[in-house]
Amino acid sequence: MFLTRSEYDRGVNTFSPEGRLFQVEYAIEAIKLGSTAIGICTPEGVVLAVEKRITSPLMVPSTVEKIVEVDKHIGCATSGLMADARTLIERARVECQNHWFVYNERMSIESCAQAVSTLAIQFGDSGDSDGAAAMSRPFGVAILFAGIEAGQPQLWHMDPSGTFVRHGAKAIGSGSEGAQQNLQDLFRPDLTLDEAIDISLNTLKQVMEEKLNSTNVEVMTMTKEREFYMFTKEEVEQHIKNIA
């Protein structure tokens, strides 16, 4: 006898007869409720642009961080449950530091994404052999990793299933479907960094419900000459004027 749909819904480590893990699928759907984040990789560097949702005038916008530094050569943008994102970002930072201490070299972006994905898939009904408690559900967050490795810009995407893939351009979050289509139409492998910034902001402008301004968007660039660099409000405003 097969279990009912609701029973497969509750089990995070039980496949349905169709070969599906419903809790992982639901976690992926949860990301579509999060703010939109866009990453574009160019020969000059990588751009991350993220929507910041200020849900109350009493909130302090500067405390809502959507783009964070993992290491000097790796930054990431997240969409989904922020509490889950902080846990995964903390793991990424620890792994990068451990790699530096042990091997005296920077961790590759792919290895960093792989280390985070290893934690992301450690959900189930029992703990591991070391006695650590297992998580009761998948992480409801997707991450865009942007970095420089051997002088080459890279962009990686990881979702709640633990799958991590390298991209030329990628959109996640509530406006990801429309944004992804726009990126497919406009992306070229030979884009300049400024063109990528304008495309990312223009794409956010199309999918965001609010009017684009320097308060509700964050922009970060990663280049060989200047690694993790967060744009100031004035710089963001200038680029918004360029696409007006």
From Swiss-Prot:
Pfam families (UniProt xref): Proteasome, Proteasome_A_N
Gene3D superfamilies for this protein: Glutamine Phosphoribosylpyrophosphate, subunit 1, domain 1
InterPro entries cross-referenced by the UniProt entry: Ntn_hydrolases_N, Proteasome_alpha, Proteasome_alpha-type, Proteasome_alpha_type_5, Proteasome_asu_N, Proteasome_sua/b
Subcellular location: Cytoplasm; Nucleus
UniProt keyword annotation of Nucleotide-binding present: no
A single Gene Ontology CC term: cytosol
UniProt cross-references to SMART domains, sorted A to Z: Proteasome_A_N
One GO term (biological process): proteasome-mediated ubiquitin-dependent protein catabolic process
Keywords on record: Cytoplasm, Nucleus, Proteasome
Signal peptide bounds: none
Highest taxon, organism lineage: Eukaryota
Function: The proteasome is a multicatalytic proteinase complex which is characterized by its ability to cleave peptides with Arg, Phe, Tyr, Leu, and Glu adjacent to the leaving group at neutral or slightly basic pH. The proteasome has an ATP-dependent proteolytic activity.
NCBIfam families in the cross-refs: PRK03996.1
Family, similarity comment: Belongs to the peptidase T1A family.
Oligomeric and partner information: The 26S proteasome consists of a 20S proteasome core and two 19S regulatory subunits. The 20S proteasome core is composed of 28 subunits that are arranged in four stacked rings, resulting in a barrel-shaped structure. The two end rings are each formed by seven alpha subunits, and the two central rings are each formed by seven beta subunits. The catalytic chamber with the active sites is on the inside of the barrel.
Protein name: Proteasome subunit alpha type-5
Source organism per UniProt: Drosophila melanogaster
Lineage, highest ranks first: Eukaryota, Metazoa, Ecdysozoa, Arthropoda, Hexapoda
